[in-house]
Amino acid sequence: MKWKAILPKLTHKYNNGNHIVKIFDDGTKVKETFDPNADHFTYEYPESFDLKITDYCDAGCAYCHENSTKNGKHANLNLIHYLFATCKKGTEIAIGGGNALEHPDIELFVSYLRSLGLIPSITINQRHLQSHYHKIVKLMDNIAGIGVSLTDPNNEDDFRIINELGKNVVIHVIAGVVKPSDYKALYGRKVLILGYKDIRRGHDNLEKHSDEIKSNIEQLKKDLPMLKKRCEVISFDCLGLEQINPKEILNISDEEFNAIYQGHDYDMFDKDGNITVSTLFIDAVNMKVSRSSTAPMDKRYSFTGKEHIGELLIKSCEGYDGKGK
């Protein structure tokens, strides 16, 4: 008798800073330092980054941290084509807006990224699932995943579309916005919990509804153990980790947490001055780069699009002492 394990297929492999990165077709990522005694990773290229390609959106969310409106402008994507040609094959790019589906070049752009060996994904608002259904279906061949920002847990037509799109859909919820009445839409699904962003309309909304938002966050903390059992996967962005603290709530050991924690957006340098962050935020509408989408306005830096992607990683760290100050 012969037994053969079905192992995931290696799709990307590249060197970055002091380590090697391997990505498999099931989404698994393995990183190993060249020096087995090294206790942290350093980076010359971003491993992944968020990319805003439009400020246009008709959803009108009260907590939108990008201030997206119907008057928002689209990015000129031709200006940033060179940047992507300098990325390592296997770099993950999370495309958003605004409503990225409204960008007239979204299909060509995603196809271009794929042709370079990059791994694009896209985040959309649930409100746009039905109106942009055909475009989403076309995009699915060239994107690794789709994030759907939850707005209506009771819309059966929307969730039929989500089910049709398959296992690469992740439901996005915001700490402080998501409520217990929304939970049923999360059961059995992959979920990303985002921290509440206290900037732009998000700031105005927080001032008006501070007690409700804080109460929702506290309730989410209490319900997290139950959600962990009932959802297929739960992940967090850096702000979500800060606001919810799943390590403490779920009693995750230091060893287990360190194995899955991707690092803080603002832990930028080691003692030798090497870059220790793997991500950045690129605002292609305003041609600005920063550590994250919530960075202070005076720490968002202009770029031309003719730079090497590694230069933008360095630029995103300017003005900080390495501890986010």
Indicate where each model-derived feature is located.
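N-terminal [4Fe-4S]-dependent radical SAM core
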Residues: M1-L51, S68, N258
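Residue-level signal for well-ordered, solvent-exposed loop/turn and beta-edge residues enriched
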Residues: T28, A62, M287-K288
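Canonical Radical SAM [4Fe-4S] cluster-binding loop centered on the CxxxCxxC motif
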Residues: P36-N78, S293
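Core AdoMet radical
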Residues: S48, E66-A75, K89-H103, L113-H132, ...
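Residue-level recognition of short loop/turn positions
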Residues: G60, G97, V285-N286
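Ankyrin repeat (ANK) tandem alpha-helical domains that serve as protein-protein interaction scaffolds
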Residues: N78-T86, E107-S111
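Radical SAM enzyme [4Fe-4S]-AdoMet core and its adjacent flexible, acidic
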Residues: D141-V285, V289-E307
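Cysteine/selenocysteine-centered motifs that mediate thiol-based redox chemistry or coordinate metal-sulfur cofactors
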Residues: E311-K325
